[in-house]
């Protein structure tokens, strides 16, 4: 297992508006990520200390994994261009006190930036029924993240500076669509989020008469799939370019065992989305 996830769902707020669906969202996304072979930690109705500890643990563990997913559902806001997720026990106060009482998502990205060669996906289904918009300096919705670390994708449930719908069923509208899209096999993450955006837009206009437009910022450098279904392969026949690529490195594999995957060739082969077998078997076929 080379994939790790931290899932947080905050619904039962003490001093700001309670939300119906984030706990359900977190339950469902955590369950799906487990099915997709992620090592999942799920935190429900978290206060600031809970959030800080779980994020710190997640970042420390990320060193041992290739891919990390952070999912948050609950209240969120921006102050002075920075994005914050809201703990369940927050008391509304002035701007400076609120900033130190919430978790700054920019800290998560800064912490992840020290891990080179990792893929980090942040999915933020927040900014619902925002209780902070009336306060001076508190803005509805999240702000754009500037210069995310290389290998990062940040997905918002709605456009910057806008609110998201909490949904008319057991999930927020965004997660309602996302949880099904994540299970579509062999769909690149960029195409998956495009699919989500179109469905969320269509449903929001139909149900609410107003468009919710999800958004992503990406610095990904490779292909990523949540769900991969290996395609049948004739081990005696493979793509000519891949064959030449592997043969040029044949000596590296002369002593390889059946369960060894080459760290250089495998991403190249997986990118074609059809050669999901050990490199050594391809070599033996030739």
Region locations from a protein language model:
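Cysteine endopeptidase catalytic domains of the caspase/legumain-like
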Residues: 1-286
